[in-house]
C-alpha cells in the first residue's frame, strides 16, 4: 500500500501545505537601498528606489486586508461546495457537477479543500460511495490541473492530475490510520459512555466507508489495480505482536473491499493471487479466536465468490436511486402506485392539501418538503442530509400514517386512528377509496410474504425456524448509532424484523383489485424493557496477580488443570495483562520441584489451546522474567537453567518455535540461555529430532553468540563445551579431516576414515564437498609453501613447487572422483571451494588457472561444471569477480573447443 499509493504525493496535507499559497494575496516587501550602496555610483536598472515608510505601512495593511478577504472568499467557496454535496442525488448529478466545477477552483489550496469535503462526505455516507466516486471521476477529468504538463505515461493508463494525486494521498492517509479512532475507544478499560459509543460507531462507519470508497474508485480505474492488491495484502497479513482476535477491524475492511471491487480483481491474470487471498480467508473463517460476527462476514464473502460475485437480493438495492426508480420499486414490491408530480402549480396529493384538510395536517407535512410529497416521514427514524435523505428500506404505506397509535406505540390524539390524522373528511375519503382496508390488513399481508424470505438470507440461516406472528414488529429499525441501552422516548422496546426478513418483491395486482397489504387488528407484541444491569468493571492489575497466585498455588498442590484453566477464564482479564499473569505463573514455580515446573508449563500450553493466551503472550512473559534474572539469581542461582526448561517445553508443545525464541536472544543476549534451551531439548527428546528441527528453523548459530565469539572456530569450541557439536557435523568434520590428512595423506586411509566417521547422507551434501576440497587445498598449499617460508603471493612459484603441487593433487584424485563423479552440482561446489581458497590467500599468481587446468586434464571436473560455475550469479562466496577475470580467457577457449568437437562429431 505504502509504495503504490505514494505516487499521489505526501500522505498528509492541510490548508497551509503544498503550492496553495502561490495564488494567495500579493505581498509586497520593497527593499530599501542604504546610502552606502550607491555612494558615488549610478544605481542599475534592477535597483529598487527608496520608498517612504508610510507607503510601506500602507502596502502592508493592504496585503493583510487582501489576505483576510482571500480567506473569506475561500470559506464562501467551501460553504457552497458543502451545499452542493448535500443536494447531490443521481437525478441532479450532471447539473451539480457543473455547479461544483464553477464554484471557483482556481488554486491548489481550493482543490485540496474540495477533495477533503468530498472524501469526508463519502466516509460519512458509505451507502452513496458509488455516487461520490462518479463525482471524483468527473472532477479528475474536468478539474483544473496545477501540476503542469507531465511526462507521457504508458498507453491505457490514466494521466496523473493534481486532483487524482491529492485524492489518492488523502485516501492513503485514511487507510494507514484506519483503526486509530476506533482503537482509542477499544483500549478503554472502563465501559464506554453513550456519547463515546456513538463516537466509536461513527469512527467505524468512516473506516469502512473509506475502504468502500477506495473500492468504488477502483471500479472506475481512478485507483490502479496494484494499489487495491496492496490494500488487500495489508489487511490480510498477520502483524507482529498482534493477536488474531485483534484483527477483526482489518478483516471487516477486507470483506468490504472484496464485496465492492472483488469482481473487477477476479480475472485470469490475478486468479492465483485471489485464490491465495480466499484460501487465507477460509482458514481465518475456521479460527475460534475471531469473533463470530467476523467469521460470518468472511463466510459471506467466500460464498459471494463461489456464486460468481452475484450478491443476494438483500444487497442488490442499497445504492442511490432516482425518484422514478423508487416509484417503480414501490409498485413492484408493495403494489402501491405513487403518481408522479402533476403540472406546474398542482400537487399529486391534491386531496390531502385541499381546503377541507385540517390545519394540523398541513402543518405536519409542510416542513418535510421533497420526500413528504411522496411518502411522508418515516416513523421512528430521521431523514438525514445530502444523498442520505433516501432510506434504504421503507414502506410507502407505513410512511403515510406516522401519527397512528399502532406505528408509534402511543396515542397522541383523542380522535380515532383514521380520523386522528386526516380529520373527518380525510377518513371518509380513505374509506371511499378502500385505503382503510389496506391500512388494517398490512400486517397480515406482510406475514404472508415472509414465507419467501429464505432467498434473501445467508445459507447458514436458511434452516432456522420461522417467525411467529406475534414476534413481528412493523416499526423500522432504529439508527445503529444509538446506544444499545437507549430507547427513543415514548416508544416501547419491541422485537425488530431482521433486514433479511423484509417482504420479497411481488407482482403488481391486476387492474381494479385493491392490494391486500393491511394490518392485523392485533397490535404487535411489546416486550418489557429489560432492567438495566450495571456492568462490573474489569479487575485491576493487582487483583489479577493475586487471583493468579491463588489459582496457580492451588493447581500446583492439587494438579487439577481444568479447574485452573476455568479459574483463569473466569478472571476475564484484559488482554494486555495476560503477559504479566503468565510471568507470575513462571516465577511461582521456579523455586519448586521439577514436577511443579512441568505442571506450570502444561498449564500455559493448556491456556494457549483454550484460546485464553497466545504465543506472543508467552514470549512477552518469558522475556519479562528474563529481565528479572539478576534479582531472581540471588535466591535461585540456577534460574536460567530453569527458564531453559520452560522454553524447551514450550517448543515441544509447539507454543513457540525455535526461531521465535532465538530472535530476542541474538548477539548473545542472556547468553548462554539459548544453548541451555537446546541442551534441554536434546535431553527431553533426542539428538536426531533436535538436529532436524534446528536445521528447519534456519537459525544462524553464530549470531546467537556474543559478538567477540562470532567465528567458526570459537563457535565449534563453545558447542563442544555444551555437548551440542552434533548440530553441526560438517563444522566438526572441517577441523578433524584436515588433521587426518596431515596424519596420513594416503587416499585409501582418507577414504576409509570418511566412510567410518561421516554419515552416508552427507556424502552428497554440497557442504561436505566444500569442506573436503578445502581440506585438500589447504594441505597442498601448506606442503608446497610451508608457513615458515615468506613467499610473495605475486611472484610465480618455481618449477619444483609446480610439480609437487601437481603430484599431490594427483594423489587425491581417486578420493575426489569418488565423491564428485557424475554430480555436476557437487563439482560446482568444488570450484567454489577453490575460489574461496584463492580469495583467502589473496589470489596467488596463476594458482586459480593452474588448478582449473589440472581439474580439467585429470577429469576431476567436467566441462559442464566449469561453464555452470561461470554462469552462476550467487553472492554466497566471495571473490567471484576477480576469479572470473583470471580464468575468463581459458573458459572462452573451453567453450570454443567444445563447439569444434561437436562440429567434428557432426561431420
Curated annotation (Swiss-Prot):
What's an example GO BP annotation here? translational initiation
W2 domain segment(s): 720-904
UniProt modified residues of type Phosphothreonine: 89, 508, 514
Limits of the MI domain: 543-666
List every stretch annotated Disordered. 1-71, 498-541
Xref: Pfam families: MA3, MIF4G, W2
Q: Name one GO molecular function term.
A: translation initiation factor activity
Task: Write out the PTM section of this UniProt entry.
Answer: Phosphorylation; hyperphosphorylated during mitosis.
Q: How does it assemble?
A: Interacts with the serine/threonine protein kinases MKNK1 and MKNK2. Binds EIF4A and EIF3. Interacts with MIF4GD. Interacts with DAZAP2.
**Function according to Swiss-Prot or TrEMBL:** Appears to play a role in the switch from cap-dependent to IRES-mediated translation during mitosis, apoptosis and viral infection. Cleaved by some caspases and viral proteases.
What is this protein's record name?
A: Eukaryotic translation initiation factor 4 gamma 2
Q: Which organism is it from?
A: Homo sapiens
The opening ranks of the lineage are: Eukaryota, Metazoa, Chordata, Craniata, Vertebrata
Query: Gene for this protein?
Result: EIF4G2
Amino acid at each position: 500500500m505504502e509504495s503504490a499509493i505514494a505516487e499521489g504525493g505526501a500522505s498528509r496535507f492541510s490548508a497551509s501545505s503544498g503550492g496553495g499559497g502561490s495564488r494567495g494575496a500579493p505581498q509586497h516587501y520593497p527593499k530599501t537601498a542604504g546610502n552606502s550602496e550607491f555612494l558615488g555610483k549610478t544605481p542599475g536598472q534592477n535597483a529598487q528606489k527608496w520608498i517612504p515608510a508610510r507607503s510601506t505601512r500602507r502596502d502592508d495593511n493592504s496585503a493583510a486586508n487582501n489576505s483576510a478577504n482571500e480567506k473569506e472568499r475561500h470559506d464562501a467557496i467551501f460553504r457552497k461546495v458543502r451545499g452542493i454535496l448535500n443536494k447531490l442525488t443521481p437525478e441532479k448529478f450532471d447539473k451539480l457537477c457543473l455547479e461544483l466545477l464553477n464554484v471557483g477552483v482556481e488554486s491548489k489550496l481550493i482543490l485540496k479543500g474540495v477533495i477533503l469535503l468530498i472524501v469526508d462526505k463519502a466516509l460519512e455516507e458509505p451507502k452513496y460511495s458509488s455516487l461520490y466516486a462518479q463525482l471524483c471521476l468527473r472532477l479528475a477529468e474536468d478539474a483544473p490541473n496545477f501540476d503542469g504538463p507531465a511526462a507521457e505515461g504508458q498507453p491505457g493508463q490514466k494521466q496523473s492530475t493534481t486532483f487524482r494525486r491529492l485524492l489518492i494521498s488523502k485516501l492513503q492517509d485514511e487507510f494507514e490510520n484506519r483503526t486509530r479512532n476506533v482503537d482509542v475507544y477499544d483500549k478503554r478499560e472502563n465501559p464506554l459512555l453513550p456519547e463515546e459509543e456513538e463516537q466509536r460507531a461513527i469512527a467505524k462507519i468512516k473506516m469502512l466507508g473509506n475502504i468502500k470508497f477506495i473500492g468504488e474508485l477502483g471500479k472506475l480505474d481512478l485507483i490502479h489495480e496494484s494499489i487495491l492488491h496492496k490494500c488487500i495484502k495489508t489487511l490480510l497479513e498477520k502483524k507482529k505482536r498482534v493477536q488474531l482476535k485483534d484483527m477483526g477491524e482489518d478483516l471487516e475492511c477486507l470483506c468490504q473491499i472484496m464485496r465492492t471491487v472483488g469482481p473487477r480483481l477476479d480475472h485470469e491474470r490475478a486468479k492465483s493471487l485471489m485464490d491465495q487471498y480466499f484460501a487465507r480467508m477460509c482458514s481465518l473463517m475456521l479460527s475460534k479466536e475471531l469473533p463470530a460476527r467476523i467469521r460470518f462476514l468472511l463466510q459471506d464473502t467466500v460464498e459471494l465468490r463461489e456464486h460468481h460475485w452475484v450478491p443476494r437480493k438483500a444487497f442488490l438495492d442499497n445504492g442511490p436511486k432516482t425518484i422514478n426508480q423508487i416509484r417503480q420499486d414501490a409498485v413492484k414490491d408493495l403494489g402501491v402506485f405513487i403518481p408522479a408530480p402533476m403540472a406546474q402549480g398542482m400537487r399529486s396529493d391534491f386531496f390531502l392539501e385541499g381546503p377541507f384538510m385540517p390545519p394540523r395536517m398541513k402543518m405536519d407535512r409542510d416542513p418535510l418538503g421533497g420526500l413528504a410529497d411522496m411518502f411522508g416521514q418515516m416513523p421512528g427514524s430521521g431523514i438525514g442530509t445530502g444523498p442520505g435523505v433516501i432510506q434504504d428500506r421503507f414502506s410507502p404505506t407505513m410512511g403515510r400514517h406516522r401519527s397512528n397509535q399502532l406505528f408509534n406505540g402511543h396515542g397522541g390524539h383523542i380522535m380515532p386512528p383514521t380520523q386522528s390524522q386526516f380529520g373527518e373528511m380525510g377518513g371518509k375519503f380513505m374509506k371511499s377509496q378502500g385505503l382503510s382496508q389496506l391500512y388494517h390488513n398490512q400486517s397480515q399481508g406482510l406475514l404472508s410474504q415472509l414465507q419467501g424470505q429464505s432467498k434473501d438470507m445467508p445459507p447458514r440461516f436458511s434452516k432456522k425456524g420461522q417467525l411467529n406472528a406475534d414476534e413481528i414488529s412493523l416499526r423500522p429499525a432504529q439508527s445503529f448509532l444509538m446506544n444499545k441501552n437507549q430507547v427513543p422516548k415514548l416508544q416501547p422496546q419491541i422485537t425488530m424484523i431482521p433486514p433479511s426478513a423484509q417482504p420479497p418483491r411481488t407482482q403488481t395486482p391486476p387492474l381494479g383489485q385493491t392490494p391486500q397489504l393491511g394490518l392485523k387488528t392485533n397490535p404487535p407484541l411489546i416486550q418489557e424493557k429489560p432492567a438495566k444491569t450495571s456492568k462490573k468493571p474489569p479487575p485491576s492489575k493487582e487483583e489479577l496477580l493475586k487471583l493468579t497466585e491463588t489459582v496457580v498455588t492451588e493447581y500446583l498442590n492439587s494438579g487439577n488443570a481444568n479447574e485452573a484453566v476455568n479459574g483463569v477464564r473466569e478472571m476475564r482479564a484484559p488482554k494486555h495483562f495476560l503477559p504479566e499473569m503468565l510471568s507470575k505463573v513462571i516465577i511461582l514455580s521456579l523455586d519448586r520441584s521439577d514436577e511443579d515446573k512441568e505442571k506450570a508449563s502444561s498449564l500455559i500450553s493448556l491456556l494457549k489451546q483454550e484460546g485464553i493466551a497466545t504465543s506472543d503472550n508467552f514470549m512477552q512473559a518469558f522475556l519479562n522474567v528474563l529481565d528479572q534474572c539478576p534479582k531472581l539469581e540471588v535466591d535461585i542461582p540456577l534460574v536460567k537453567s530453569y527458564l531453559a526448561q520452560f522454553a524447551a517445553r514450550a517448543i515441544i508443545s509447539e507454543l513457540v518455535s525455535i526461531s521465535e525464541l532465538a530472535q530476542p536472544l541474538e548477539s548473545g543476549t542472556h547468553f548462554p540461555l539459548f544453548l541451555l534451551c537446546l541442551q534441554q531439548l536434546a535431553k527431553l527428546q533426542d539428538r536426531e529430532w533436535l538436529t532436524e528441527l534446528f536445521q528447519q528453523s534456519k537459525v544462524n548459530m553464530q549470531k546467537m553468540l556474543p559478538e567477540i565469539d562470532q567465528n567458526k572456530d570459537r563457535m565449534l569450541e563453545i558447542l563442544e563445551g555444551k555437548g551440542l557439536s552434533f548440530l553441526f557435523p560438517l563444522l566438526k568434520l572441517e577441523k578433524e579431516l584436515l588433521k587426518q590428512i596431515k596424519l596420513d595423506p594416503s587416499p585409501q586411509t582418507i577414504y576409509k576414515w570418511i566412510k567410518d566417521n561421516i554419515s552416508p547422507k552427507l556424502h552428497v551434501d554440497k557442504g561436505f564437498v566444500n569442506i573436503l576440497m578445502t581440506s585438500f587445498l589447504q594441505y597442498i598449499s601448506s606442503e608446497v609453501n610451508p608457513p615458515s617460508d615468506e613467499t610473495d603471493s605475486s611472484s610465480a612459484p618455481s618449477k619444483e613447487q609446480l610439480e609437487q603441487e601437481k603430484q599431490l593433487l594427483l594423489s587425491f584424485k581417486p578420493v575426489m572422483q569418488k565423491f564428485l563423479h557424475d554430480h555436476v552440482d557437487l563439482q560446482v561446489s568444488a570450484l567454489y571451494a577453490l575460489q574461496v581458497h584463492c580469495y583467502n590467500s589473496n589470489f596467488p599468481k596463476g594458482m586459480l588457472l593452474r588448478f582449473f587446468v589440472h581439474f580439467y586434464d585429470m577429469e576431476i571436473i567436467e566441462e559442464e561444471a566449469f561453464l555452470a560455475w561461470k554462469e552462476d550469479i550467487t553472492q554466497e562466496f566471495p571473490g567471484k569477480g576477480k576469479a572470473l577475470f583470471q580464468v575468463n580467457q581459458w573458459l572462452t577457449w573451453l567453450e570454443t573447443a567444445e563447439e569444434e568437437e561437436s562440429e567434428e562429431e557432426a561431420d
